[in-house]
A protein has these predicted regions:
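Small-residue-biased structural context
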Residues: 1-188
Length: 188
């Protein structure tokens, strides 16, 4: 069964746009929590946020953007989103290379938060509305996204109480699930 948010619920996902929007809200909450965190909470909170952001970007790149590119026929918009993801990966690597006692740690997390916030605004204001009107089977795509995300969360140990065991991997190397084609129904 596909989870509705990054591991905290087992609700079924309504559609791809809803799933990604929920991820965006969760990431915003994590960045806000970082800003209010105690010194002891900074490292684990930043690590969890980076892991979830990597997973979110990966499912968008593997499944969502290919469908969005075909549906919108707007290569420039998707190319820009992918460039922003590449920049975010560099910012994530910078955060992950530091600990909270590093002088630039909070600034690096703040830069990542600003970058992610700008990207989210762009997706939610331009890309998501276009996909809603493009005739894409967003429910089937949402199921594919949720299944892939769940696999990645499990691989990183983010569904378990022990996050740090398998979670030290920087990149998850599993074959991507195939995104449903436009109009294709996904079997149960």
């Amino acid at each position: 069964m596909a989870r509705a948010d990054a591991g905290e619920s087992t609700d079924l996902v309504a559609d791809a746009v809803d799933l990604l929007t929920r991820d965006h809200r969760l990431l915003e909450e994590l960045f806000a929590a970082f800003a209010a965190a105690t010194p002891q909470q900074l490292d684990p909170l930043a690590r969890r946020t980076c892991k979830l952001l990597r997973i979110h970007a990966q499912i968008e790149e593997e499944l969502f953007y290919p469908v969005a590119r075909r549906a919108t026929q707007d290569d420039a918009m998707i190319d820009e989103a992918e460039r922003e993801h590449a920049e975010a990966r560099q910012a994530i690597a910078r955060v992950e290379s530091m600990t909270s006692d590093h002088a630039g740690f909070k600034s690096a997390v703040g830069d990542l938060a600003a970058m992610a916030t700008a990207h989210v605004r762009e997706e939610e204001s331009r890309l998501f509305p276009r996909l809603r009107n493009a005739g894409v089977n967003l429910v089937a795509l949402g199921v594919a996204l949720a299944e892939r995300r769940d696999t990645l969360l499990d691989t990183l140990g983010l569904h378990s109480d022990d996050e740090e065991g398998a979670a030290n991997q920087r990149e998850v190397q599993q074959p991507p699930a195939r995104a449903p084609q436009e109009g294709e129904q996904r079997g149960a």
